[in-house]
From Swiss-Prot:
Catalyzed reactions per annotation: tRNA(Pro) + L-proline + ATP = L-prolyl-tRNA(Pro) + AMP + diphosphate
Record-level GO BP terms: prolyl-tRNA aminoacylation
Gene that produces this protein: proS
PANTHER family recorded: MITOCHONDRIAL RIBOSOME PROTEIN L39/PROLYL-TRNA LIGASE FAMILY MEMBER, PROLINE--TRNA LIGASE
Protein name: Proline--tRNA ligase
The keyword Protein biosynthesis is annotated on this UniProt entry: yes
Localization (cell): Cytoplasm
A molecular-function term among this protein's GO annotations: aminoacyl-tRNA deacylase activity
Species name: Stutzerimonas stutzeri (strain A1501) (Pseudomonas stutzeri)
Assembly description: Homodimer.
């Protein structure tokens, strides 16, 4: 492709509304253009990268035995009402009516549509297991679209759905899809981690997220420094570093703390070590009007997912108001603790191993110092309540946890029978009786993958594409293309490279465009391999080659350039 036949629309300045690096660089490199909030046009340069990601996803889905379909983007309300999600789904679901006043929605996901397809097309156990997938545009009406393609309203997604007679069959497909996802992200050249995840509102019995590691990620993930263990913060089990509780060394004291309403104020005013403090959080219980106290160490954070999963705690988690706390305990939120607490209490594992610690006295403006379990108060129920922190022991017993930010680019679920039961999706089983199908679902944000790759691969000059995603493999940049010798050598090399199957962008802009601008544009776009043709180099029989990640160029003989490129370009 020649730039004279291509739309090269780079920008010198970064648009003011672009915050994350992928948004900035995709706009500057002319890959996307904003149409409205959360809506983007894919320009020719960006679309080439998107299609490459899509092709790899499609190849690996086909290898995994999935069957490609294409379902409507617009879905009838009746299907969502049948599953129960029409009422449950929030304003992210864009709803509309046609000219006949029939209700529809723009699909953010396709569980209902695929379940309807399965119940109409599948009738025998002999057709199972079966796995359908599509690569299609989705729409979610995000309240605050931001970060370009990272959290837009319209996006390209690969979603797959499998149907099974039993859990064993589902597990086999789930494992196959897990491996397919690992293959996809490895082929895309991404530094990623598959992590154990909470099933959330989708439900089911098993879930993994796939995260690209990047500082701009919205999620915290924990992984072992000595094994393959990885989980998101919501799911990771918190193992205390201590193995047993130290013996008491202080007397119990009640002190006045009128100006210490927070852990920070208690630490600053009384010289208490933060790891010797606890914080008491009060939430609604499952019984109406009941409150439950949850206690974690002062330097730890409550994990709301773990808390909501406790049998005596209401789900979703609801924190008690100050009025409710005062009515039940007789003190405000800044003065709560486990001693003489009149409501049920659950403490974190790390709290159970504390000695000589400080806590609120359940009296306004008073705290206890030197508290000890089984001396001053009995040990209450103990549970895993907190988020893990860096340095915690890995739950698999191998090494310590590292915490990094991640961008979620894929998610797989074992759905079970949530949709098939609600929508009566059955086939005739081997015993001649109707059997409700068990489902799995598997998603990849294809357009988000492109942005995530940039978040992980860039420098001060622009994008550093992994080879698999680069819109072009080679940038061919002639100096003084208008001169006969340079033009002939450039055109000959361009023909040879394209005949060899390489994707080449020949920068044939005229002399009004300086060499510096040409180099800057190619580095901004991130084309991995650059070949410069100049009259001075040709006089010596040489061409200049530079990989986008190299600091300095090198000279390669004209006669050797094809073999050299063959050795450097991964195809």
């Amino acid at each position: 492709m020649r730039t004279s036949q291509f739309l090269l629309s780079t920008l010198k300045e970064t648009p003011s509304d672009a915050v994350v690096i992928s948004h900035q660089l995709m706009l500057r490199a002319g890959m996307i253009r904003k149409l409205a909030s959360g809506l983007y046009t894919w320009m020719p340069m960006g679309l080439r990268a998107l299609r490459k990601a899509e092709a790899i996803v499609r190849e690996e889905m086909n290898k995994a035995g999935a069957l490609e379909v294409l379902m409507p983007a617009i879905q009838p309300a009746e299907l969502w009402q049948e599953s129960g999600r029409w009422e449950q789904y929030g304003p992210e679901l864009l709803r509309l009516k046609d000219r006949h006043d029939r209700e529809f929605c723009v699909g953010p996901t396709h569980e209902e549509v695929i379940t309807d397809l399965a119940r109409n097309e599948l009738n025998s156990y002999k057709q199972l297991p079966i796995n359908f997938y599509q690569i299609q545009t989705k729409f979610r009406d995000e309240i605050r679209p931001r970060f370009g393609l990272m959290r837009g309203r319209e996006f390209l997604m690969k979603d797959a759905y499998s149907f099974h007679l039993n859990q064993e069959s589902l597990q086999e497909t789930y494992d196959r899809m897990h491996q397919a996802y690992c293959n996809i992200f490895t082929r895309l050249g991404l530094n990623f981690r598959p992590v154990q995840a909470d099933t959330g509102s989708i439900g089911g019995t098993g879930s993994h997220e796939f995260h690209v590691l990047a500082e701009s990620g919205e999620d915290d993930i924990a992984f072992s420094d000595s094994s393959d263990y990885a989980a998101n913060i919501e799911k990771a089990e918190a193992i205390p570093r201590e193995t047993e509780r130290a013996a008491p060394g202080e007397e119990l004291r009640l002190i006045d703390t009128p100006d210490a309403k927070t852990i920070i104020e208690l630490v600053e005013q009384f010289g208490v070590a933060v790891e010797k403090t606890v914080k008491t959080l009060v939430v609604h219980g499952v019984e109406k009007g009941q409150l439950v106290a949850l206690i974690v160490r002062g330097d730890h954070e409550l994990n709301e997912i773990k808390a909501a999963n406790l049998a005596q705690v209401a789900s979703p988690l609801v924190f008690a108001s100050e009025a409710e706390i005062r009515a039940a305990i007789g003190a405000g939120p800044g003065s709560l603790g486990p001693l003489n607490l009149p409501i049920p209490c659950v403490i974190d594992r790390s709290v159970a191993l504390m000695s000589d610690f400080s806590a609120g006295a359940n009296i306004d403006d008073k705290h206890y110092l030197g508290l000890n379990w089984e001396r001053d108060l009995p040990l209450p129920q103990v549970a895993d309540l907190r988020n893990v922190v860096a340095g915690d022991p890995s739950p698999d017993g191998k090494g310590s946890l590292v915490i990094k930010r991640g961008i979620e680019v894929g998610h797989i679920f074992q759905l079970g029978t949530k949709y098939s039961e609600a929508m009566n999706c059955q086939v005739m089983g081997e015993n001649g009786k109707p059997a409700t199908l068990i489902m799995g679902c598997y998603g990849i944000g294809v357009s988000r993958v492109v942005a995530a790759a940039i978040e992980q691969n860039y420098d001060e000059r622009g994008i550093l594409w992994p080879d698999a995603l680069a819109p072009f493999q080679i940038a061919l940049v002639p100096m003084k293309y208008e001169t006969e010798a340079v033009r002939e050598a450039t055109d000959k090399l361009y023909a040879e490279l394209t005949a060899a199957g390489y994707e080449v962008l020949l920068d044939d802009r005229d002399k009004k465009t300086s060499p510096g601008v040409k180099f800057a544009d190619m580095e901004l776009i991130g084309i991995p391999h650059r070949i410069v043709v100049s009259d001075r180099g040709l006089a010596d029989g040489m061409l200049e080659y530079k990989h986008r990640r190299d600091a300095q160029p090198q000279q390669v003989a004209v006669s050797d350039i094809l073999s050299f490129i063959n050795s450097r370009v991964h195809r």
